[in-house]
Amino acid sequence: MALVVNDRVKVTSTTTGTGAFTLGAAQVGFETFATGIGNNNTTYYTIFNQGTNEFEVGLGTLNANSTVMTRTTIISSSNSDSVVDFAAGNKDVFCTLPASKAVYLDADGNTVNAAGAGFAVAMAIAL
């Protein structure tokens, strides 16, 4: 099992509740989690309910054929950063890189971690 982040991975789902998500077909122009992430791997994800504006960003683990994703760790959400009890409706489920996990170079070429103390300073200088 590896942590995999990939571009253009986006599917639909109609799963409700707080449990694992059944992943549907790839949206037009995108690929499935099976193709882009791979069986039994983990990835950062976003789930967005189109009808209610519920959202969740977290770390998920795919099952053996990448058709189900277990919501392992919640990073942020519309439920005060706790697991979301998703209502009925169509959801977009896609691979993402959460801002709190980003590492980038500042104007001087120094590495800055978004969760680190230097992030606020770098942002204040940039503004």
What are these model-predicted stretches?
Residues A34-L59:
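Ser/Thr/Gly-rich low-complexity blocks that favor extended beta-strand/coil architectures
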